[in-house]
Amino acid sequence: MAVLYPAVKAIGEGLGDKLFYLTAKTITRTVAEQAFSILEEKGLAFRSITLTAKEKICFCEETECNPDACPYAKGHFDRVNDAVYDMLEKQKKLTRESIERQAEDFHVCPFELSLDLSEWADGVICDYNYVFDPTAHLKRFFADNVSGDYLFLI
């Protein structure tokens, strides 16, 4: 909390666009979610999301992301905007469980839904590999032609 509060305050003061809380283990992710919850209970207006690895959040036996192999990929882009809008209207805290429910309700890929939702979040809780591993990084935030003033908690 001693590190999170000043980072959230900096975002509120316009000193950054988005906060990335980087974790290595599930317990650290849980602690980050709890810290955001405590601040939200005290009145913080801040949308946070927890990103879960594709292999862990995928509904299919095999993680094969193409419309021929995955029923959630087929027509995904026809439905995902409604799923994103609906979820953003209803929730501030976007967790694995809530993303899975929304993905099931709208029959969309839960991993891709979480990535789309992350663009609307003030804070992103994720594995540090999404930032530091070039094969896993979040291209929508860290590609060469993308810019943003991001704060990182490691």
What do the PLM-derived regions correspond to, one by one?
Residues 8-12:
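Short glycine/serine- and small hydrophobic-enriched flexible loop segments
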Residues 130, 146-154:
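SF2 helicase catalytic motif II
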Residues 137-147:
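Short, conserved "post-DEAD/DEAH" coupling segment immediately C-terminal to helicase motif II
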Residues 15-124, 128-132:
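A substrate-engagement module of RecA-like helicase motors
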Residues 1-6:
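Walker A/P-loop
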